[in-house]
Amino acid sequence: MRLLLSVLLVLVASVGVGLVSAVPAGSSITPPPPIEPIHLLSAPSPSQDSRRPWTRLRDWVIESIWGISKSCSHPHSSSHSSSRDRPPSQALARYGSDVVLRFYPGSAQDAEALAEASEILFLDVWASTPEFVDIRLAEEVISSLLGLLPDSLRTAYTPLIDDLAEMIHASYPTRRSAGVGDQSGFMPTVRQSAQLGDLFFRDYQPLSVIVPWMRLMASMFSSHVEKISVGVSYEGREIPALRLGVREADPEPARPRKTILIVGGSHAREWISTSTVTYVAYQLIARYGKSPEVTRLLEDYDWVLVPTLNPDGYAYTWESDRLWRKNRQPTSLRFCPGIDLDRAWAFEWDGERTRTNPCSETYAGDAPFDGTEAQQLAQWALAQTQSANATIVGFLDLHAYSQQILYPYSYSCSAVPPTLESLEELAMGLAKVIRLTTHEVYDVTSACEGITVSKSTPHVQTNPGSSGGSALDWFYHQLHTNYAYQIKLRDRGSYGFLLPAEYIVPTGREIYNVVLTFGKFLLGDAAAHLDHLDWEAAMATEPEGVVEAQQTLHQPEGGEVAAAADQTEDENENEDEDEEWDEHGWEFRR
């Protein structure tokens, strides 16, 4: 305890230095100004704050480091409604006439026509699922789009978001309280609550907060956490990561260390992917030594978590354009910078399709690995496998949105992965775990299928982003990572990329349980004694403030890990049927 207090006090003493050093060279992010002094021993009245002294000390440290004020409220609270009645002029200028439409293609011909029209008009396709395709466009372009579509599609659409500028404005956390409104950048906020709990997950956080948070985790939990870098971005920012794991001092004989890589933020606007990676990291960190499952997984594997592979683009979404997708390196057209990092990998790269159109949202560059950050991660992964005595056995690439679990291949539906049966088996188990966690349904399919085969719809292909050069295919084929998945997180389109902050924790809980099940599946027979996901124990050990409203959600008591993957497609499609939990395993009785 004394050592921990010493570390915290050192951190507090170095607040000024730490915040300045957290800003990358060349960044326009302005560090938060010095906060007003807070007396360490002062405590609010019991009616206002019932936190224990140690909890108050912890929250005070976090407030001091990141300048979080208790007077700040959640951006969606009514107390700030007056300041959010109308987006600022710059938001109206950029997004004022933009809307999001949802189309319902009924045939392969409809899908092909929609994809072709989207390319001709340089439209932003947000998502493709078995039921719909979401497209962002300016209101004045709607007539042009409809003119390029067949009659069957001209009425087969509905408005999804008709106030995009307002939704974008509301998606940012509120600025700090009065007196610092002239500061650039956004500060993290907290909800009005008797307990501040874990402030970091109360809202989306900018890069200038994420990096110091990662340093803090590595400092406080040095026995099993290490902050590392997997590369440097085009603009010179570090691509930070957390490596979690406990290694033997001198293993005899030396065996390759099995590594599971979890990546978020490849596409800058997908904020929920970045928050989810940090949430999963925090749960694994905090529960090591308390949860037998987590302890075993950190002893048997290294877990490398990269919250944002695209730090330049992520910073740009906070500073300029909330809906920016690509990285920020220049292209042949000065006014169209950026490369799609999930189309820049060397395996089955098909950048010829977009080579002449750098303005495309899926522009793959002029050559494989033209995207700096993709190249950096690939070099790091190769170095780990070739020189660092490591084997990457699992890869989870988090994206948004549409709630899908995708497995290789992305480049072609005619190519069959050699481990298809195992990939589908585990993917079905992961989807079931999510449904048991929050009752949300995630579809399972091959990544090549933007719109997939189902019993209710024909097989149509509408997703222009499903192509070669994906990280998913590269890790699976080049590094022989047998269990590689891309997971598209919440939601199914009500908010799209602008998912409100109150969904950070529920989405994080879904993927945390996915990660536990993923790790146990890889352990195989070695996980026999870890045959229960004890949901009640998991909730009991939940760090303070994380559970909140989720405590009211009924959770099953446990089951066998191996059977979590024993799920058929028919079961996945019948989620609305009455189901009864079998207390002896991961199976349902109907």
Curated annotation (Swiss-Prot):
Residues 549-590 are annotated as: Disordered. Belongs to the peptidase M14 family. It holds the Pfam family Peptidase_M14. Residues 1-22 form the signal peptide. The keyword Nucleus does not apply. PROSITE patterns: CARBOXYPEPT_ZN_1, PEPTIDASE_M14. The keyword Signal applies. Binds 1 zinc ion per subunit. Zn(2+) binds at residues 267, 270, 399. Disulfide bonds join 336-359. Residues 203-522 form the Peptidase M14 domain. Keywords: Cell wall biogenesis/degradation, Disulfide bond, Glycoprotein, Metal-binding, Secreted, Signal, Vacuole, Zinc. This is Inactive metallocarboxypeptidase ecm14. One of its GO terms (biological process) is cell wall organization. Its main location: other. It is found in: Vacuole; Secreted. Inactive carboxypeptidase that may play a role in cell wall organization and biogenesis. Substrate binds at residues 267-270, 325, 342-343, 400-401. Its cofactor is Zn(2+). One of its GO terms (cellular component) is extracellular region. Residues 23-175 form a propeptide. One of its GO terms (molecular function) is zinc ion binding. Residues 567-582 have a biased composition (Acidic residues). Glycans are attached at residue 389.
